[in-house]
Amino acid sequence: MDQYIRAIESQYIRKDFPEFRPGDTVRVYVKVREGNRERTQAFEGIVIKIRGGGVGKTFTVRRIGAGGIGVERIFPFASPAVEKVQVLRKGKVRRAKLYYVRNIRGKIRIKERRD
């Protein structure tokens, strides 16, 4: 049964994403429909979590918006609305889930990873 599910899911899994981890700063380009026209919107921030596997795999990106208010967006890896992902900076962290970043005020400093 599991092999059948994996075979069907493999059709929908995207391989064009770069490899990134929690702590990395990424820019996600999302297709947005406004009425009858479509445009691309960029969302830049720190990856605070990657969860799931297969078609249900998602990643959460957090940034500080206008007025110092934190904004988080969850993007599915398999979503056709996500056009592309750019890794701007590789961060060095010791956790898989960076929930503590939510409690930090101001700009977040994460050390850069050297690979």
From Swiss-Prot:
Biological processes, Gene Ontology terms: translation
TM helices/strands, residue ranges: none
Family matches, as InterPro entries: Ribosomal_bL19, Ribosomal_bL19_sf, Translation_prot_SH3-like_sf
Pfam families documented for this protein: Ribosomal_L19
Keyword Ribosomal protein included in the entry's annotation: yes
GO molecular function: structural constituent of ribosome
GO annotations of cellular component type: cytosolic large ribosomal subunit
Keywords noted in UniProt: Ribonucleoprotein, Ribosomal protein
Cross-referenced PANTHER family: LARGE RIBOSOMAL SUBUNIT PROTEIN BL19M, RIBOSOMAL PROTEIN L19
Record function comment: This protein is located at the 30S-50S ribosomal subunit interface and may play a role in the structure and function of the aminoacyl-tRNA binding site.
Family per similarity comment: Belongs to the bacterial ribosomal protein bL19 family.
Name of the protein described by the UniProt record: Large ribosomal subunit protein bL19
Primary gene name: rplS
